[in-house]
Amino acid sequence: MDKFVIRTPRIQNSPKKKLGEKVYKQATIESLKRVVVIEDIKRWKTMLELPDQTKENLVAALQELKKKMPSREVLRSTRIGHAVNKMRRHSDPEVAGLAKEVYTEWKTFIEKHLDRPSIEVRSDPKTESFRKNAQKLLSEALELKMDHLLVENIERETFHLCSRLINGPYRRTVRALVFTLKHRAEIREQVKSGALPVGTFVQTHKK
């Protein structure tokens, strides 16, 4: 009678965490407070400044800004501090209170770290050229000037949803937005009046 050796797989016990052992969480460079993506700062600024903006969007923008500590140079070049300061006088107590927190934290930080610049992340010239062209197409479809805040807000929201890349999805989304704005007057008016939030409008056309 033949004999067979049956090998059973060894069960490897997962290493147990030692009591008191520190658990490290991996962080991306953009999650650090001192790392400031200029594009994000400008996007949040347009969200704060756009007329008839919803409370939810204002709170969302302020909460994101609260996670960052921009340098004096960034505050000056983007004027984001001015936009946040204006929100301190908002009629909604939650928006005004959150804006006050952000403004106070930034002011305190700047006073303590005058000589320590933050790390700035900017787009390259080629990317900016593509985006300017997209803004031109959007402004024509909206029948607004190219430097209108609504045009800027729509383009920045599109760029953000496309992972801040000039890629296929970005180009297709811009084309879809332009087509709708040109050929569907009722949606164009809803976007211009604020009845249709920019975020919702862009999200429904993302390709």
UniProtKB/Swiss-Prot annotation:
Which part of the chain is the TFIIS central domain?
130-207
SS bond partners: none
The listed locations are: Nucleus
Keywords of the record? Acetylation, Nucleus
Q: Is the keyword Nucleus assigned to this protein?
A: yes
- Where are the N-acetylmethionine modifications? 1
User: InterPro entries given for it?
Assistant: TFIIS/CRSP70_N_sub, TFIIS/LEDGF_dom_sf, TFIIS_cen_dom, TFIIS_cen_dom_sf, TFIIS_N
Q: Which Pfam families match?
A: Med26
The UniProt record lists the TFIIS N-terminal domain at 39-113
**GO terms for CC?**
nucleus
Sorted alphabetically, the Gene Ontology BP terms of this entry are: DNA-templated transcription
Report the principal subcellular site. nucleus
Q: Which family does it belong to?
A: Belongs to the TCEANC2 family.
Q: What is this protein called?
A: Transcription elongation factor A N-terminal and central domain-containing protein 2
> What organism is recorded for this protein?
Mus musculus (Mouse)
Q: Which gene encodes it?
A: Tceanc2
